[in-house]
C-alpha cells in the first residue's frame, strides 16, 4: 500500500453488505469511493444560522431537515482534513500545528470562537431525535469528542442540567475542550463507567443519549484505522458492550423519559438486533416512530431473526451515504412507560463548613473581579470550589462524591490566595458586551491571529483584563498593560 493510499475496504464487509442490500448495493458501494462530506453546525447559543451564513466567507448548503446544519461544498475545503465527528482541535497538551486558512473551516478564527462545530451531517440527526428541552435533566452517556454533546447543549439553551460523560481518560479532555469552546454553562463533565453512573443516578434523567461505541463501518470513507480494525468478531464484541450500556441507560431514566440509541455502523447485530433484544427484555419500553424527513430510511427487521421486539425495529432511522449527505448513521427513540426499578439514590453533598467558607471567600473574589473587569455581576444560584477552581454548578446537581469528574459545572476561574484569575471557559460562556473592556478584531486581522498564537498586540485603552473577540464574538481573554494586550489564550490551544 503506497503512502497516499488508504487500506482497502474489507472484502468480507462488502460481501456482507451486498447480501443485505441486494439491488441497493451498487449505489452503496459507489458512494464509498466518494470523498467524505463535511458538515458544519451553527452554535445557536452564540448566533443564528442565518447570521453564520452572512459571516461565512463561502457558500454553505443547508440541510433540509436541520435549520442549524449545513454541508460545506468539497471545493471550498481544499486540503482540509476534517474528522468525522468533531472540530480540528488537539488536546490541551498539544498545540494546534496548522496555519490559519479562511478556506478550511477547522482553521478559522470563527471556529476558535465556537461559532460552529464540524460534524458528519448524518450524525446531526441524533440530538434532534433526543429533542432535549430547556430546564430538563439530560445525560450524554458516551459523549466524546463532543459533536452530539455540543448540539444537546445548544438545544437546551444553557438551561437545566446536562451531564456529559466519557469513560475514556484521554478523550474526556477533548470533550471538555469542545464544550468549553461552545460556551456550555450548564454542563457537568464526568469520567465514569455507565454502571457506576447508574448506581448514583437511578431514575434521574428526562433524556439519555447512548451514542454507543461501535464497529465504525460508517467511518470507512474517512478513517483508514476503521478499515484496518474491522472484523466480524469486532461486531460481536461491540454488540455485547452496547447491550450493557443500554441497560445502564435505562436504569437512569425517569418514567415517561426518552433514550436515543445511536451508532455509526451498518451492522444489524449492533443496531436492530441490539434493540430487539432490549425490547424483548423490557416490556415497559417502546420504540417511537419519528417524523420521516428527507433521506430518513427505516430500520430493517428483515435483517435479524424474528422474536419479541423485532416487529418494532422498523421504527428506527437509518441514514445511508448513498441516499443523502453524510457517512451513515443508525438511531432509534425509546420511550419509557414504566416505573423506575428503585428510588433515585441522588443526594445533595453533605454539609462541609470548611468547604462552604472557602466557597464564600472565592465568591467574594469572583464578584470583585466582576465589578472591576466585567460590565455586569454574575451571580449563579450555586457556587462551589473544587481544589483551587471555582465553578457555577447547575441547579439540581446531586452529590458527585466518589465519582470521577472533570468539571462539575461552568469553570469560572482559579482562586490564588487573595486574587481571582478568570478561566478561558468564563470568557467563552459570555458575550463580548459583558466585558468592561473589549477588543473586537476582524477575522482576517493579523492581530486576531497573533492573539490565537499567544502573542501580544498593540491596543490603546484602560489597563486590565480585556475580552478579545472576532467580529463581536469572544475568542478569549487578554490583559492590557501600557498600550499592549498580552494574550491569555490557553497554551495548549494556541495556533502555531
Residue locations for each model-derived region?
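Conserved SAM-binding loop of SAM-dependent methyltransferases across substrates and taxa
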Residues: 145-158
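Polybasic, low-complexity RNA-engagement segments
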Residues: 1-20, 26-53, 327-330, 337-496
